[in-house]
Amino acid sequence: MSSSETKGRNEEDVAEIKKAIATGAVKDPSNLSAIPPIFVVSGANFSMNFLLLCIQSSVCCACVFAVKKLGIISFRDFDMKDAKMWFPISFLLVSVIYTGSKSLQYLSIPVYTIFKNLTIILIAYGEVLWFGGRVTALTFVSFIFMVISSIIAAWSDVQSALASSIPGASSGVSVGAMQSLFGALRGLNVGYFWMLVNCLTSAAYVLSMRKRIKSTGFSDWDTMFYNNLLSIPVLAVFSLIAEDWGRENLNRNFPAETRNFLLFAIAFSGAAAVGISYTTAWCVRVTSSTTYSMVGALNKLPVAASGMLFFGDPVTVGSVSAVGVGFFAGIVYAVAKNNQKKNERRQAADAIIPMASRKP
């Protein structure tokens, strides 16, 4: 391969990494450790993502065990009864990762992000059914603005995808063009199927985790520990089944010249995931599944804005509008939740004041 081809591939890799960061292509909340995993998976030949996540979870558990031995933190000792209750949550987490990777094989990252943000609405109404939550009109408006933000950000990519798949009128409708179009539509149908499964498993994971935290009385460290520990065997099985463990593929994923640094980066990202896993459990426990998902959608916006300000990403009307509408959606959601809390406190106060003492 010539040096110019190598340079071109590297530039494409960098562009894809920045795109993934800005749109939140990585969807595992317990393993988002920023730069180290991005470095590992950014190589054109890296394909063993389940192995990567398995090693990260193992390192995460080892770090927590070490800190517990030092007496800095405390959490429950491993209990088989608790493990059986929590295992479905860990399995759902791995299912979210797998279905997300399958849908990304057929759909572009912006389209994927639109549907992931639609999951927020699914989670909100799941909380209504499971936890007696309430979706106010203003909260629903914030969901709509978040989806609009994603559509604006993805519009140029959607247009280019449609233009490339639909033959132009001037070129005529040939058999090859029609076959190409039907192939693209077939791929989209498969992609939308995996996307639907991903949205359902994502909602089930977040809602089930909150429900299980309440039923088991887990602390944040308990949640973090069991989530990572029970993910290890599931990730290992997925890796053995879905990934190529041949010598040639292992050498391609872990080349000898960078192997030690790659393993160090994976280990470092696993250690960094401790804080992210803990704060994830804390957020779901003290707020709600909907708020956690909304924050997950909002955290892409500062990254996208910094990409335009500091890293040379193209500043267009669409990109600026998408970030602006997204921030507006966050403000509307915050106002809606604040108003909802005030109403709940007012209703609670009215419930405990005797009728004779109430002012007209």
Curated annotation (Swiss-Prot):
Q: For this UniProt entry, what is the primary localization, expressed as one broad class?
A: Golgi
* NCBIfam families cross-referenced by the UniProt entry: nst
Transmembrane feature ranges: 50-67, 85-105, 111-131, 135-155, 165-185, 187-207, 221-241, 261-281, 292-312, 315-335
- GO (cellular component) term, any one: cytoplasmic vesicle membrane
Q: To which protein family does this belong?
A: Belongs to the TPT transporter family. SLC35D subfamily.
- Where would you find this protein in the cell? Golgi apparatus membrane; Cytoplasmic vesicle membrane; Endoplasmic reticulum membrane
Q: Which domain of life is it from?
A: Eukaryota
GO BP annotations of the record are:
transmembrane transport
Membrane-protein topology: Multi-pass membrane protein
| Matching InterPro entries | SCL35B1-4/HUT1 (IPR013657), TPT_transporter (IPR050186)
Q: Which residues lie toward the Cytoplasmic compartment?
A: 1-49, 106-110, 156-164, 208-220, 282-291, 336-360
**What function does this protein fulfil?**
Involved in the import of GDP-mannose from the cytoplasm into the Golgi lumen.
The protein's name in its UniProt record: GDP-mannose transporter
Topological domains annotated Lumenal: 68-84, 132-134, 186, 242-260, 313-314
Describe its partners and assembly state. Homooligomer.
Q: Which UniProt keywords apply?
A: Cytoplasmic vesicle, Endoplasmic reticulum, Golgi apparatus, Membrane, Sugar transport, Transmembrane, Transmembrane helix, Transport
